[in-house]
Amino acid sequence: RSESHAVWASSDISSAPCGANEEMPFREADKADTQLTFYAATKKANESMAHSYAHLWNIPTTMFRFFTVYGPWGRPDMALFKFTKGIFEGTPIDIYNHGDMYRDFTYVEDLVRGIRLLMDAVPGGPETAVDGDTLSPAAPYRVVNIGNSDKVRLMDFIEAIEAETGIAAKRNYMEMQKGDVFATWADASLLRNLTGYAPKTDVRDGVAKFVKWYRDYYRV
């Protein structure tokens, strides 16, 4: 295709740019000026710089806000990998805020499909807008959430891992980390309006796929 379209990942969880916003579910148009960490501030700056590029050089640009992506080949420093590894090895897993936290877990295959479909939803003039759009009036630019639209309690997530491994976790309950947020929850209606698609993998099914991959890859 001859038409250019820059696509950027703003963050791996929308709590980064949304910061202390307590409105649920998170909408792309919600005010996002109360970042709680330097990491989150860089993500908000990333979105601002992308908007500037889109305006100055008329480059159609879509920013993705990912919500707690998980699945096979996930990063070893992320919760699902760390929890699964700790459970298999019999080492304690750190559970912040005593497990009373919520995350919108999004399976990686759903994420990839959402990205692929959004690549064809090129932002442009007002004629490209849909209901609930974040299309900028100053540039061919929009922000889109990609999330499962379902907040899951952290303890339920851990119990799903225990059920798949058949092993009870050794739990180390801890206080909330400074700069962390109590919950993330995506309003993915813009993704649906632009593409007709919405992530749908139930967290228990996604965890089962990850644990199977982990068993096969690490031979446990």
What is each of the regions a protein language model found here?
Residues 69-70, 176:
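Hydrophobic pocket-lining residues within nucleotide cofactor-binding pockets
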Residues 11-12, 145:
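Rossmann-fold scaffold of SDR-type NAD(P)-dependent oxidoreductases
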